[in-house]
Regions:
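A residue-level marker of the well-folded mature domains of exported/periplasmic proteins
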Residues: 1-180
Length: 180
């Protein structure tokens, strides 16, 4: 629609690194600049991308999670688990945030502190993120932390922890919205 209306440029924040490839290629063939925000697409058909180094951001999230777990009095000699929630594994930003988190965790977390095997995908739905967080807490008796890789996940985790009055759980999340 923007192209038909004579846009001088297109600004996109891709939630899926694949879904906009064809559209960006068509726009670029018309010599209209494409600027990406926050995530790359799986193509070189864009002019510039302004984004966070999401691997580094994931590492910082893991570092913060470890600090908060230690500060909460969790012993490195006792087993504990941390869960991960994200909106989509089709977003390179999400993939990189998880990758950075897992890499840092593998290097620096006590050996008895583990990441749960199931990473929950909520599809950008806050209610699903709430449900996923509640299931994670119910399923894992050793859960002491939850990492939300995006706003939807962070909001869902915060709502669940608040509803359940779970002050014993450490939460680290991205993209803080007003409701969190």
């Amino acid at each position: 629609k923007a192209v038909k209306e004579g846009a001088d440029g297109i600004l996109l924040a891709p939630a899926n690194s694949n879904s906009l490839v064809d559209s960006c290629e068509k726009v670029r063939k018309k010599k209209i600049p494409v600027v990406l925000i926050d995530s790359l697409i799986n193509s070189t058909e864009f002019d510039v991308c302004y984004m966070t180094d999401n691997i580094d951001a994931g590492e910082m999230a893991a570092q913060e999670m470890l600090t908060m777990l230690h500060d909460a009095g969790n012993s490195p000699q006792e087993p504990l688990a941390v869960g991960i929630l994200l909106s989509s594994d089709a977003s390179q930003a999400m993939v990189n945030r998880v990758s950075g988190f897992l890499d840092y965790w593998a290097k620096y977390a006590p050996t008895k502190w583990e990441i749960t095997k199931d990473i929950a995908l909520n599809g950008g739905d806050v209610e699903k993120a709430e449900s996923d967080a509640a299931k994670l807490l119910k399923k894992n008796e050793n859960i002491k932390g939850i990492y939300g890789c995006n706003n939807t996940s962070t909001v869902g985790i915060a709502k669940t922890l608040t509803k359940q009055k779970r002050t014993d759980i450490v939460m680290v999340g991205f993209d803080m919205a007003e409701e969190t």
